[in-house]
Amino acid sequence: MSGVQVRVRVGREHYALPVTRVLEVAELGDLTPVPGSPPEIVGVHNLRGRVIPVLALATLLDLSDEEPERIVVVELDERCAGLAVDAVVDVGELPEASERVDSPYLTAAALADGLLVGMLDVDAILSSVSPEAPA
Amino acid sequence: MSASDEEIHELVRQEAGDCLQRMEANLLTLESGDGGVGEIEAILRDAHSVKGSSAMIGWGEAANLASSIEDRMEAAREQGGLPPDSVGPLLHAVDALGQALDGEPKRETVAKSPPPDAPTIRVPAAKVDRMLDVVGETVLYHRRLEHALGTVSGGGASEELDMGEQLLDELQDSVIQMRTLPLSTITAAFPRAVRDLASQEGKEVELAIDGAETQLDRVILDGISEAIVHLLRNAVAHGIEEAGEREAAGKPAAGRVELRAGRRGRMVAIQVADDGRGVSPELLERADEEGSLVEILAETGFSTAERVTDVAGRGVGLDAVKRHVEGLGGGLELRSEAGRGTEVTLLLPITLALMKVLLFERGGHPFGLPMASVGRVVAVAGTTSLGNRPSLELDGEVVPLSDLGRLIEAAGEPLPRNPPAIVIESLGRRAAVACDELLGEEEVVIKSLGAILAGMPGYLGAAILGDGRIALVLDPSFLLSKAATAATTMDRPAETEEHAAGRVLVVDDQFAARELQRSILEAAGYRVDVARDGREALRRVGEIVELDLVLTDVQMPEMDGFELLEAIRADEEHGSLPVVIVTSLGDEASRKRGAEAGADAYVVKEEFDQQTLLETIERLAGR
């Protein structure tokens, strides 16, 4: 499983997702928090008139030291969301993802330039988030 | 270019759906005895066409069912008529055919049943919504461009910009219109529902539909069908009497239910009226005393039928209908005359895309509430507490008061001193929610929060404001129930000392402006009356004893502020009443006109400052 990957940085760690799954990359800008939404949703973003939720990859992956400035917009059927990342590092091919990982949001990891790059499971991320049932 | 299988299936299903609706209507006509060979042949044609298209794409079951209907109708054509008792089984066959066609999941589409002669294209609804998003955003960018250019150049560019704005408005209107469909897209099932219900009840009822061409937002149409069926059921089961009772009352044996639709101003009114027994005189009397019949019926789940049937009682479910309609920014009206009948009116906005909301801020973020649910705005000065919970006293009634931030569990700073509170009203329930600041009243495009957040309670959607910020539009019924159950809803706000101030009449046609001024003045201890235009104000001036000052806007319908001022000055009794003009007209000519007409003070809205206004008023109204 190879192909062109979009490499992003969150905190000190690197992750990647297939370029074919990325609709666009946008500035994070001012977010509007949605009180009562799940903790991984940091707010909603105005994407040229379309209101989309923004998911904190740092919260999902249990990372710290993140300073999100960009969103990577992804979609699964009707479910569209922006993934908050610190920066987009690179777009290109990665070595084969041969390392096993233990996270529901990653499929595997690849070793690139001496760094471990986690391969994001976009579908798992988008289907895992849903608002809690009314109290 | 070739259409996918799914697209072809969808097309066949839609065409067949139109055929089924016509078949059903024609069968009902035949049953009523009005029909003849014309109807039989029409059914035959439709059955034949469904059979053909189903067979072509390999839907065997549907094709067989259509074929059996075709056989039956061919026999009827040879006999020159259809025995009425065979209509029932044929309707069942049409139902079965519909179910067979529905075997696969459907996709939502716009324009389900176009007028037969106009050329039509079918477009997935999501594409239209996306278009609306982009148009809305283009309008915002255009305004920003206008603003940026306005500071560097004048003249020629502004004409071009104006033209662009007009075109964009037109574009937005036409996209919004693409979201609307005629009511007829949902009425097709009603004659059948009424027929089935009437026969189940052992009654004879005819349904007349008028105004089915009235256009409504497709999202409203999707949700409103159930409410209308509920009202029709109520009318048949509880409104229309048994034939014997009707004849004894001198009415025709067959009851009549009318479904009428039409524009009423910026709304659409859908009425379900019956000529049945109406509600009891006792209930009408109670309604006179307590205010509104619809509230009584909806609140108590009242039923006017003495026996309990498996069908909804007159009032049962009316609360659900009312909540649904109010959630859409509409309203419910009910009129009834004992012995003569009942008429229920659903008032609905033409489009859901555009909604009037009251915008305000809490914790640095903008929020909106549908204007339809906002009763008034007050400034929180004195609070009482009921069972250790803060509340306000409004018109002698205790209303729970909550901090909006606490209700929706938002992080935020403490409320300011004397915060404005919005009084939400629905179904006789009231609650006041306090916020930091009112932003004003605006007509906004309501957008979905997206599939991931769509199921979340508390929000109707979001609106994008002129500065690009997103305002969350809150669900009033969610706030009402939260306010009723939440334990601690607010820290005690700082109270101000009361001082005996005067009585002021605030005149403004804009709700938000009027309520804002009212809240400022009430917080300062004034007694405040309001009027919506000069004419109403002039009447109030004559009525209110001990009025100390009039605070008026200039641009208003009926009678503007200058005319009001002139009329007051010309009045012998009230000629010396202090009048303060609050207006957005800051130009020299307007100021001069105000001074000439005898204004005591002139406050320009852009320079609006609470403290200055209060000082001015205190100086003029001080006793």
Where on the chain are the PLM-derived regions?
Chain A
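An acidic, low-aromatic, low-complexity terminal/linker signal
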Residues: 1-135
